[in-house]
């Protein structure tokens, strides 16, 4: 879809949260700029809000070298598409960024108990799009 958007000078948006899609869109950045279009995966409720939080935190803590984010929802469920993508992705394992590189790790590579204010919840790492995007948006 991205090549067709570049060729037709049409902006590209989607609701994905997959690292591979961000990586591909980023690799096409110069072509998109030449076509005067925006390539923006992740316009759903997953990556753009958390990426904005990452930039906000970087502005408030400019000397920070690491970022750890967590979120929780009350009473909501993943969409059918999100659940399907998560199940399909289990075979690919987890991902983290270490020393500037995205590396493969086991599913739930790290677990942590976090107090979200409304409850203490067990959390785990997931291969979310922020692993790709936050690195670029926070430099």
Across the structure, where does each feature detected by a protein language model lie?
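Glycine- and other small-residue-rich loops at beta-strand/loop junctions that grip anionic moieties
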Residues: 17, 42-46, 123
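Adenosine-phosphate binding glycine-rich loop
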Residues: 36-74
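Active-site-lining helix/loop region of Rossmann-like oxidoreductase modules
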Residues: 59-139
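Short, hinge-like loop/turn segments at secondary-structure boundaries
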Residues: 6-7, 29-34, 57-60, 84-88
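Rossmann-fold NAD(P)-binding glycine/threonine-rich loop
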Residues: 2-3, 7, 15-38
